[in-house]
C-alpha cells in the first residue's frame, strides 16, 4: 500500500534525514555492561530469560517450577484463576457448556457463579453488545488500519466520547466500563477486521449484530463469517482460547502497562488502549502474527515439509538471524516463567488436533508439531547450555 503523501518526508531531504537517524542512534546508545553493573532490568525478563517480579495478585497464579529439598526444579506449567486450575475450567466448558462467560465472572468477582448468577451476567453482557451505526461508520469504517490492533486502540479510545461519565475511577464506574468493554470488544474486533478486508482487499462488507442468546465465542464466529455458520467444535475451540487468554498472572507486558498507566489516575479507556498498544508488539501478543508469517516463510524455503533435517536447517538459520525477519527469534517458543510445558499450549494443542482432523488439515498440524519438537530441542541446547523451553 502506498504511503500517504502527508506522512512522507520530501525525497530531497532523505539524505539529511538519514544523517539525523545516525545521530539519534549514537545519542541514545547505552553501554550494555552498565545494565549488569547497576542491576537494571531491561524489561520484564531478567538476563537469564526468567520473568521479573513486578507486583502481587491473587487473581491468577502462574508456576513453571517446583521446589524439591530446597532446590528449584523445572516442572510442567500450571495456571490458576482465583485458585481454580484452568485445565478444569476449560474441560468443564468444552464438555458441558461455554466457559468464557463464567470464567470472566470468576476473574472479576472471585467465585464461580451459580446458574441464576450466570444468567443475570449473561443478560448484562447481552444488553451491552451494541455499537451505534454512527460509531461503526465514523470510527471503524473511516481510515481502517492495516493492523487490527491499531483499530482496536482507536475504537476503545473513542468510546470515551460516548461515555457520560468517563473519568470517574470509582469501583462501580470502572466495573460498568469494564463490562461495556467485555461486551463490545468482540464486535469492535470483528467489525475492524471486516473494514480492513473491505478497504485493503475489496472483500464484500457484511456487518451483523450480536445475538443475545449466543455465547461470546459463537457470536464472534457468526459475525465474522458472511454466512454466519460455524461448527460446534469451532465454537468450543474458540471458547477455550478465550478462557486461556483471559488472564495470566498480572506480570505480562500489557497487564504491567495497565498497572503503570492506571497508577496515574487516568481513565479506563486510556489505560486499556495503552495495554492494547503493548499487546500489539511482536514480543508480546503480536508474536501470534509473527508465527503465521514465519510459517509462510518456511513454506517458501523448505521443499519437503516432512523432512526433519530441512526443518532443522531452516530453524537454525532463523536462530542465526539469517532467515525470516533476521531477529534471531523462533516465534511462539520459550516463556519467561514456564519451563517444561505451557498449560495453555497443552490444552490448545489437543483441540487443534481435533480441529485439524475435522478440516482435513492433519499435514499442516503435523508441521506445527514438528517445528515445536525441533525448535524446543534447538533452543534448549543453544549456546551449549541445556535449558527447558516450552512452546
Feature-to-residue mapping (PLM):
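Non-transmembrane, aqueous-exposed alpha-helical and coiled segments at domain scale
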Residues: 2-391
Amino acid at each position: 500500500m502506498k504511503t500517504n503523501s502527508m506522512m512522507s518526508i520530501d525525497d530531497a531531504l532523505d539524505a539529511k534525514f538519514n544523517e539525523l537517524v545516525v545521530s539519534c542512534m549514537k545519542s541514545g546508545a547505552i553501554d550494555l555492561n552498565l545494565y549488569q553493573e547497576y542491576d537494571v532490568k531491561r524489561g520484564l525478563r531478567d538476563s537469564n530469560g526468567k520473568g521479573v517480579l513486578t507486583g502481587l495478585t491473587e487473581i491468577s497464579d502462574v508456576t513453571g517450577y517446583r521446589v524439591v529439598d530446597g532446590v528449584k526444579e523445572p516442572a510442567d506449567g500450571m495456571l490458576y484463576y482465583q485458585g481454580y486450575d484452568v485445565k478444569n475450567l476449560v474441560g468443564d466448558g468444552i464438555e458441558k457448556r461455554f466457559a468464557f462467560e463464567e470464567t470472566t465472572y470468576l476473574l472479576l468477582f472471585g467465585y464461580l457463579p451459580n446458574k441464576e448468577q450466570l444468567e443475570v451476567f449473561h443478560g448484562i453482557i447481552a444488553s451491552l453488545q451494541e455499537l451505534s451505526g454512527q460509531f461503526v461508520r465514523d470510527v471503524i469504517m473511516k481510515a481502517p488500519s492495516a493492523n487490527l490492533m491499531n483499530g482496536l486502540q482507536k475504537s476503545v479510545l473513542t468510546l470515551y466520547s460516548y461515555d457520560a461519565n468517563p473519568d470517574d475511577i470509582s469501583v462501580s464506574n470502572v466495573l460498568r466500563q469494564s463490562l461495556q468493554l467485555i461486551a463490545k470488544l468482540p464486535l469492535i474486533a470483528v467489525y475492524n477486521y471486516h473494514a480492513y478486508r473491505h478497504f485493503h482487499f475489496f472483500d464484500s462488507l457484511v456487518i451483523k449484530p450480536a445475538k443475545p442468546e449466543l455465547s461470546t465465542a459463537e457470536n464472534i464466529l457468526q459475525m465474522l463469517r458472511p454466512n454466519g455458520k460455524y461448527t460446534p467444535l469451532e465454537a468450543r475451540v474458540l471458547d477455550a482460547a478465550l478462557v486461556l487468554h483471559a488472564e495470566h498472572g498480572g506480570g505480562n507486558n500489557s497487564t504491567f502497562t495497565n498497572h503503570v498507566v492506571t497508577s496515574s489516575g487516568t481513565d479506563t479507556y486510556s489505560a486499556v488502549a495503552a495495554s492494547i498498544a503493548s499487546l500489539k508488539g511482536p514480543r508480546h501478543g503480536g508474536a501470534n502474527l509473527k508465527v503465521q508469517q514465519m510459517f509462510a516463510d518456511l513454506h517458501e524455503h523448505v521443499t519437503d515439509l516432512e523432512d526433519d533435517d530441512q526443518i532443522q536447517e531452516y530453524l537454525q538459520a532463523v536462530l542465526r538471524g539469517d532467515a525470516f525477519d533476521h531477529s534471531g527469534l523462533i516465534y511462539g517458543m520459550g516463556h519467561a516463567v514456564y519451563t517444561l510445558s505451557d498449560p495453555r499450549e497443552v490444552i490448545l494443542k489437543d483441540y487443534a488436533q481435533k480441529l485439524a482432523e475435522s478440516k482435513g488439515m492433519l499435514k499442516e498440524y503435523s508441521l506445527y508439531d514438528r517445528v515445536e519438537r525441533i525448535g524446543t530441542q534447538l533452543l534448549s541446547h543453544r549456546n551449549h547450555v541445556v535449558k527447558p523451553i516450552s512452546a
